Amino acid sequence: MSTIWIAIAALSALALAFGLVLGYASRRFEVENDPIVEEVEAMLPQSQCGQCGYPGCRPYAEAVALNGENINKCGPGGEAMMLKLAEKLNVDPQPLEGDADVQAPARQVAWIDESNCIGCTKCIQACPVDAIIGSTKAVHTVVSDLCTGCDLCVAPCPTDCIELRPIAPTPANWKWDLDTIPVRVIQVERHA
């Protein structure tokens, strides 16, 4: 019985010693991160889709914060996220595609033709934001509120039953073209 207690005490002392050494090493060799990079990364949608030309949201955040990369390359974040980045970094807002003459594309979401879906789950595995629900050998469907339109689920589908479709306009996502609305000032005559 005493050998068990000796073994427990020895392992506990060893664990304590390793814990102290690792704790000291983590404090001593800590790498300082740029807080601006952390804030920019927190603002990005974290879909890791690669539409910006970088392998994920962290490298894009580093390029924006440290190298002055354009803030208009994140497709899933859209115009709202670009405006937040512009305000945070004190830069001028940029058109989403980088060209003022090009109209920003309508937001699209994945759509699954459920009559052709074989339930292989390849699209579920490819989706970085878990916007596709379903199980093996069952029909899958897309939760359009979660879908970022990154297009990563389309290629793995063996039956080509997934396509991107534009979102139908609703009062929540409608963009008013304020330039075409005529504004007239009507003079009011006051009678005494």
From Swiss-Prot:
Coiled coil: none annotated. It is found in: Cell inner membrane. Gene3D superfamilies: 3.30.70.20, Electron transport complex subunit B, putative Fe-S cluster (1.10.15.40). GO terms for molecular function: 4 iron, 4 sulfur cluster binding; electron transfer activity; metal ion binding. Its cofactor is [4Fe-4S] cluster. [4Fe-4S] cluster 2 binds at C117, C120, C123, C157. Residues 108-137, 138-167 form the 4Fe-4S ferredoxin-type domain. Keywords: 4Fe-4S, Cell inner membrane, Cell membrane, Electron transport, Iron, Iron-sulfur, Membrane, Metal-binding, Repeat, Translocase, Transport. Its EC number is 7.-.-.-. [4Fe-4S] cluster 1 binds at C49, C52, C57, C74. One of its GO terms (biological process) is electron transport chain. GO terms for cellular component: plasma membrane. Belongs to the 4Fe4S bacterial-type ferredoxin family. RnfB subfamily. This is Ion-translocating oxidoreductase complex subunit B. It comes from Pectobacterium carotovorum subsp. carotovorum (strain PC1).
